[in-house]
Structures are given as structure tokens and as C-alpha cells.
Amino acid sequence: MMKQAQQQPPPPPASSAATTTTAMAAAAAAAVVGSGCEGEKTKAPAINSELWHACAGPLVSLPPAGSLVVYFPQGHSEQVAASMQKDVDAHVPSYPNLPSKLICLLHNVTLHADPETDEVYAQMTLQPVTSYGKEALQLSELALKQARPQTEFFCKTLTASDTSTHGGFSVPRRAAEKIFPPLDFSMQPPAQELQARDLHDNVWTFRHIYRGQPKRHLLTTGWSLFVSGKRLFAGDSVIFVRDEKQQLLLGIRRANRQPTNISSSVLSSDSMHIGILAAAAHAAANNSPFTIFYNPRASPTEFVIPFAKYQKAVYGNQISLGMRFRMMFETEELGTRRYMGTITGISDLDPVRWKNSQWRNLQVGWDESAAGERRNRVSIWEIEPVAAPFFICPPPFFGAKRPRQLDDESSEMENLLKRAMPWLGEEICIKDPQTQNTIMPGLSLVQWMNMNMQQSSSFANTAMQSEYLRSLSNPNMQNLGAADLSRQLCLQNQLLQQNNIQFNTPKLSQQMQPVNELAKAGIPLNQLGVSTKPQEQIHDASNLQRQQPSMNHMLPLSQAQTNLGQAQVLVQNQMQQQHASSTQGQQPATSQPLLLPQQQQQQQQQQQQQQQQQQQQKLLQQQQQQLLLQQQQQLSKMPAQLSSLANQQFQLTDQQLQLQLLQKLQQQQQSLLSQPAVTLAQLPLIQEQQKLLLDMQQQLSNSQTLSQQQMMPQQSTKVPSQNTPLPLPVQQEPQQKLLQKQAMLADTSEAAVPPTTSVNVISTTGSPLMTTGATHSVLTEEIPSCSTSPSTANGNHLLQPILGRNKHCSMINTEKVPQSAAPMSVPSSLEAVTATPRMMKDSPKLNHNVKQSVVASKLANAGTGSQNYVNNPPPTDYLETASSATSVWLSQNDGLLHQNFPMSNFNQPQMFKDAPPDAEIHAANTSNNALFGINGDGPLGFPIGLGTDDFLSNGIDAAKYENHISTEIDNSYRIPKDAQQEISSSMVSQSFGASDMAFNSIDSTINDGGFLNRSSWPPAAPLKRMRTFTKVYKRGAVGRSIDMSQFSGYDELKHALARMFSIEGQLEERQRIGWKLVYKDHEDDILLLGDDPWEEFVGCVKCIRILSPQEVQQMSLEGCDLGNNIPPNQACSSSDGGNAWRARCDQNSGNPSNGSYEQFE
């Protein structure tokens, strides 16, 4: 008995052989298959199994003899139809007694190859069984678990030059080096003789030579004979295999071509269908063996399924409409690829002949319709169900991004990703530990997209961010969801607008002064009409702890000044040490030993001061606890004291600002005088600063005397809880501490001043200062607020000065101001304060793991006309802040300004904004609001009094600043750690705006073009940044980052990337499936990874992209524009804030969701 259908076109994407009349006649004769068939009459040599499977394809796997299989006669009939390219006619009789599937015992399997076409097929002898033993079942399960070993082979599609009679066969270099024996390059030219055996054990001899320009591997002598003997044409494929015995094997795979006209003597396809069905029905009725022929290249799919595979697929999966799945397909040159699809229906393929059949009863839709022709019906054992839906972007409930190691796949976060989002990687899915099966049903892509759009807002805001709100300082926030919070913010915004609170009016309306005083005083939420029981606040220890940082508004002025004075002394010493160490590198080598004793003395003095501060801190904490209890007892009396508290705060802020400016100028004088060489050009500047210093000292003494006379009666009469006299030594010690604190912040900020910058603060009138929620941040020229560089990249960017008119003087020197060094308004008649330019190399790098966020705002009428900003804060423009996942430049001047300008909710609500959920955000100093008597809680319970960087989740590493501020001092003013760690970086991003801003949701993006484009000034150029971690992107997966310094070569990098994205083995060169690794260098050029030397690659790489074969093909067609190859359904990157629907991207956020690689640096 001969074989059937060995050369007909198979289903796409696999190719099949050409059809000949002789082969068609053999296939027709093989249709009449009965019981007890014996196979071919002539004795044929054994077929090499490795070569047979290589020619059959990577997806073909035959069950072993003696195992249980499930035979589908419906699939067998489809093989005949595919071979004849003709469907079953209506007059073919049906067999009602023939079930749709037969459980059979596979007696033997014989491999065959057509002697004329070399097409492979298999002969199987089956016997239906009603019961089976354990041995057959175990053998079937064992065969399912055992994988066929990977053979060394390469496959090439022949070109026209390869099949020409006068040419040779060009072998790819890597294939020749891997499969062929090595050449002797001492010969000229290098050449050798190769022998290869085909499926019929015929030996073919070729001459392998390395020649040409450029040089290449060629098979010359003997190749033309092989092409003519096998009747090969362009489009056919040849396969070279090296078996276990290191012998070369040679096979062919013919291209899919239209069949020629069939002779009239050949049996019709209907007869073939009848013969197949009749043989199966007879065997099922008598339990007798029967023989079938399986042509893997002609059959659309396997119709003899291992019993264990069938059981696992049918009973291990819960199939439902909308379920997502993967399916493996063969690609060109024996490659494989998984395609994603969705189950759209479950119905019978042929409800008339095969009712309730499981053969291809699943209707599916494919995600990529243009990737190749695929069937719209599949069987359940062909697919791999995915246990979760496909989100365009997952909900942003993950924590901050951290440096990842090579073994990150075993970490807790990676396991969470694999369990929650298996659709992100091609190899990630949820499987049952026993059956290794996906078990959870899903929905279709469109349904899940609609569900995500409708429910993501409420789910993310109410379910997750409500947890973050519980960690804030005020206990009332525990009962507020995100939606309620947004409504209250909008309500407050409308209320302020109704009361004529405007930023651009010269003066505030008189009717809103009580509201302003209320905002400045920072009264807790329960005093504003919100239902909260005072008893709960008194008896709840956690609430008392959360209110600890904000209770300092009860401290007298003497204590605040004492804290500032002590801080100034501490930082003065530290600044001198930093200046000595920075100037040491500029002086000759002989002067270096002279500086060492000075540094040692400064360190000793600093240690003594830290010990004294620790003792003072303990005493101060006791006093704060007493004051806190007094505050709780006087809650009912507090509304009557609002006006006095507001007046006290205005005067207190005035004193703080003057003292800070005075100390800053003194430190600048000392730093200039301590320099070894003072140029003649700097002498006039020093003299001018000395004059200003004398004026400031005189004004400060006068203002302090006046303010103390005004404040003491108010404190003694209106605030009984604050007039408790402290011992004189106790008052003096905190006063010294306050001076030291401010000096430390002033000089530390100077250490971060970039080169060629100077401070020019033009003061306004000498009225008391009233700060707003925006005055804690420096005015900038729309400077990007983040950096991805540990160097001083951001420091070199100059900021615009704050210009104002004084009624007693004219405007002077309009040079640029360093970041956060200039306050928005100065409440005294100071003329100007200038800072000496300092080279950045003299500044110590103290800020390697601190995030910088600056709210950019501008004065509307800078330097024009006379304005009074006492009760009219300057208008501000809103610019979204962003943070990156790497180290950034920190301007310590931010801390300087925050110390002197505590935030308030003055006539505007706090505006929150999205921040990237994977961003590492740190706080510069959490004690900014605790020194000057400002309640840190706004009307809604948010810590309003914090500085810019205090609003974020983590603090500076204590180890970096042990020599600057003691741990006890820092902890006394720090937000409780449990509350601080729970603040969501996606909810709080340090963004503030004007009161007329539209605010719809706490998690929404402000996309008002008119508001964002309010300024007519051109945007600043983006900053150049350097990365310590490199971003990696792959389609369908979230972006990752890796540390290039951990690898020593390309092989380690590829292995790590394969593990990171669960594509082990697919990035190897021997796979030849088209995967490419490309990267963008510092010149924004797209290059193939692996061409440059490793050291040069590490120095210039900016981001890496893993491209699939389809993306590589798209790049070849559309040009090398990597930015346009990101699909619209790209999974959202960890650095885009978790918002897949954002219409725009910050220029420096590095967000891949906007579909452009131009943003990646």
C-alpha cells in the first residue's frame, strides 16, 4: 500500500511540495485503506528521524508507538481535501455510527519519504479501544513531557542564482561555521569536500570553498547535479542537518505551487473521502486495527492527537467566549512564532455530518490580520489559553521603580507581574501547578478595552488611592475617597472664585481677609465644619503622631529663632569644610597638607555641636508634647484667635526672611575672603555687599524690636496656651539652634549653585509678607524639573530673575538667578542681594539620590511698573513636574527657600497631579515646615506646610548627611514614617496652580491648552542627561531598566534581556527567527546591537529595543525610524505615570507611550 497526499500545498504559513500526476495517483490509491494494511511492499532503508522531523517542520511531533491517541476522522478527511484542493461534496455519504473521535492504541509508526519529491509522511497503525491500561496511559503522558532534542541545522530558501546550472549555492557565514566542518584557511583559497546523505540514504558530494568579493562560503562542484536530480526551483528550500554522529544530512522542502491537471484515470476526491471514512467506521465497529497516512505538510493540522494532550486541553481549560489565547505557527526557514487571538465563538464546524464534534469548534479572531493567513477555526488542543485579559495599560498600583538585578524574575514584584499580567510577555502566563495549564477565562480585546476605559477611573481612584489618602496627616482623610476629595477641591475652588479671590488684582477684597487668616493659620479640618470628634483625635495615638510635624505653629518666636540660629552655625562650619576640600584640588600640591589640620578641627567642632544638638532636641521634644496637649485642650477657643495668629505669622515670616538674607550675605563674604586669590574685579562687589550688610543689620534690629513689642501682648492675652514662659537658657539654646539651621541651609544651597550665576533679589515694599501655595517654588523659565543624570547637568541651566520695583530705588543688575535661590517677594526695603559666582567643581556632590521637582512659574509683568505683592501674589503658570527613575541633580537652594517660605493654602486649593508610579521620589528635608509655627494641615488635611520635596514619599538617605544634621533633629520634624511611606507618588507630584484651574479628578491630566500655553515665552531647550540605568523596551511588555555596568559583554546582556522578558533562547543567533536587538546612541542613531566594541557601546547607549521579525520587516519597508514602530496598543511604560490615555508627554519624562523614541534619553 502506498502513501497519500505527500506533496500538496499545506495551509499557510507553512509551505508544501509541488504536485505531480504520479504522486496524485499514488495518493488516490492510498485512499482505500482497510484493516490489516501492511505498508509498502518493497524494503526501503530506514529514514533518519532527525532529518525527517527537520523536513516535517518544527511543530510536528509524532506520538510514540504503544501510546494512546485520539483519532479524528474529520481531520483526516480535511487532509484529503487539502491534498486535492477540493472540499467534501454533498453527495459523500455520512456515517452516523462513526463517532467524531476514536480513542485508539497506536501499534506502530513508520517514517516515509516520497522517492520522487522527497516529501515526508508517516504511516500509523491504530486500533480503537474501549478500555486501556496504565502502561499505555503513562507512556502517553511521558511522551507529552519529553521534548525532542534540538538538532543543529540550517534552512535556506533557494534563490535564482542558487538554482542556476553555472552557479553555486551561497551558504550564510554563520550557518557554514556552525554546520560544516571548519575550513583550513592556510590553503589559498580555503576549500574542502563535503558529503551529505538525503532521506533515501543517497550520498551527495559538494565542494565547499571560501572565495569571492566579498568573500563568502559556496558549494560549487556537485551542486548543479543535486539541483537537477531533485528538480529544485527558486522558492524551494534545502535543509542541512548535523546529527549526533557529526554526519551531514540533506533534505528539501518544496514550495507551495498550484497542482497540474490530473489524469482522468485518477480516482476522484470523493472516493478518497469515502475510503477513509469507511475504513474508520469498520475499525470502530469491530475494534480492529487500521492504517492511516499522515502528511504533516499537507494536513492543516494534526488529526492524531496524543491522549494526554487531549485530556489536558479539554478538561484542564475552562473555555469561554472572549478568552485570550496564544497559538504557535511556523515561520520562514523553520522558525516558530506565537500569535495572539481571541475566542469569538464555539460551534460545530460541520453540524450535519459531525455534530457536537470538538474538531476545530472554536471560532477565533487574530490580533494581527496582516501577519499572514490563519484559520478562523482552531481546536482546543492547538491553543494555549491566557488566564487574564489584555489591557492596553495596567492600572498604576505598583510601587516605585527600583534598580533591577539579573535574577529579578524570581523577585516578589516580578512574580506579582507574572500572576497579575501574563499578557505583558510572550512567555508569561498563569498556570496550574499540577496540570501546568492556564485555568482562568477572560474577555475579548474589545470588551476588556471598553471595560478598562469605563472602570479604570473609579477603580484606580476609589479602590487604590483611597488607601494612600488614609496615610495623610489628618484623620478626616480616612473617610474621604478620591471622588469626594476631587469634588471638595472643586467646591473650594468655586467658593474662592465666588468671593473674588483673584491672583491678578492689586489688592484682595476686604471681605476675604478672615478666609486668608484662616488659611494662614492652618486650622485643622474639624474646626472648619467637618464632622470629626475631638475625642478621637485626643485618644488616638496615631493621629497625635501624624499631627506632630504640624504642631509647631504654636511655638513662640524665640524658639523658632533659636532653632534657626543653631542651624546657621552648624552649616557655616560645614560650608567652610566643603569650600576647603573643593579648593584643595585647584591649589598646588604643596598646599594640600596645610588644609588637613583645618578639616580635622572642623570635624571635631561639628561632632561637638551635634552632641549639643541632641541634648537640646530631647528638651525641645518634651516641650512640643506639652504644647500639643495644650493645643488639643484649646480647640474650642481657637476660632477667636485666628486674627492674632495671622498677624503673628506675618511678622514671623518677615523676621525669618530678613535673618536668612543676612546670614546668606555673611557667608558669601566669608567665602570670598577665605579664597587664596581675590581678583580686582571682585573687590567692588565685596565692598557693595558690605554696605548692604550694614543696612540689613540695622533694619533687622529695628524690625525685631517692633515685632517683639507687638507680639508679646497678643501672646499673653489672646493665646493662653502659648504664653507659658520658658527658662532663659531653654530659650537661648533653641535660638542658637535656629540660627545654625538657617546658616546650614543657606551655605548648603550655595554649594549647589552652578557656575556663572548670581543672585539678584529686587525687593518689593516693606509690608508683611503673605505667601501662597505657589511661593514655595522658584520662578523659572519653564525649566524641566527632572534630570536623569548624577552629574551637574541641570545645574548649568540659568533661571530668570525676579524683577520688581521699589518705590525708593531703581532696578539694578538683571542677571540670572540659580534655581530656587530667589524668593517671590521680599517684605523689606532691601535693595539687592548678589551672590558670588562659584565654579561647580568647587561644589561637593551631596545629592546623588535626591529627586528635584520645581514648579515653574513666572511673573506676568516682570520688571515693569510698581506692584505691591503683599496681598497680591504674582500670577503663576502651571508646568507639570516629572521625575525620572535615575539619580538627579539637586539644588540645595530649594531647601533654603522652603525654610523661609512655608506653604499655605492662601486663596487656592492644593492641585495634585499624576506622577510616574515607577519614579523614585525623595524628600530633601522633611523639617521645612516645622520651624516657623505653621500648621502643616490645610482645609482638606493635606500637609500644606511642607516644602517642595517634603510632599514626596521618601527622605534623603540619612547616611549621606550624618555630618550635617543629627538624626534626632531630623526625626523631630519629619513626617511619621508610616504615613510618609504610604503617600502615593501617582497622586502627589508637587504640582500647584492658580485657583481658576479646572480640576475634574485627582488622577486626571490637565490638558487645557489655553491654560498650559498661557505664557508667551518660548520653552527652554531640553537638558542633556546621562543615565546610569539603560531603558529596555519590547513590544507587548512594560519597559525595564538595566545597569550596563553589571555586564562584561554582549552575551551576558542578551542572556539577561532574554530572562527579563521571558524569551529565553529566542535572542540566540542560531535560532534565525528574525529577532533583533537595536539601540539608540547619544547621537540618536539607531544601530544594531553587537557591532561596536563593548566599552564604546556601554558609553554611548541610551535605550535598547527588542524587535520582533515583523517590526524588523516594517523598519526595512518604512525606513530606519525606530520611533514610528511602537504599536498603538503598546503596553504602558513604568515611567509614563501609568496613564495610557495621555494625549501628550512631558519632554523629559521618557515616556514611551507617546509612540516616539525621540523622547528617550
From Swiss-Prot:
A GO BP annotation: auxin-activated signaling pathway
DNA-binding span(s): 154-256
One annotated GO molecular function: DNA binding
Localization terms from the record: Nucleus
Annotated PB1 domain residues: 1027-1111
CDD domains in the record: B3_DNA
Major subcellular site: nucleus
Gene3D superfamilies reported for this sequence: 2.30.30.1040, DNA-binding pseudobarrel domain, Phosphatidylinositol 3-kinase Catalytic Subunit, Chain A, domain 1
InterPro entries, per database record: ARF_dom (IPR010525), ARF_plant (IPR044835), AUX/IAA_dom (IPR033389), B3_DNA-bd (IPR003340), DNA-bd_pseudobarrel_sf (IPR015300), PB1-like (IPR053793)
Spans annotated as Disordered: 1-20, 573-598
Keyword Nucleus: yes
Protein's UniProt keywords contain Nucleus: yes
One GO CC annotation: nucleus
Keywords: Auxin signaling pathway, DNA-binding, Nucleus, Transcription, Transcription regulation
Top-level taxon: Eukaryota
Tissue: Expressed in roots, culms, leaves and young panicles.
Quaternary structure (record): Homodimers and heterodimers.
Family: Belongs to the ARF family.
This protein's domain notes: Interactions between auxin response factors (ARFs) and Aux/IAA proteins occur through their C-terminal dimerization domains III and IV.
Function: Auxin response factors (ARFs) are transcriptional factors that bind specifically to the DNA sequence 5'-TGTCTC-3' found in the auxin-responsive promoter elements (AuxREs).
Protein name, UniProt field: Auxin response factor 19
Organism: Oryza sativa subsp. japonica
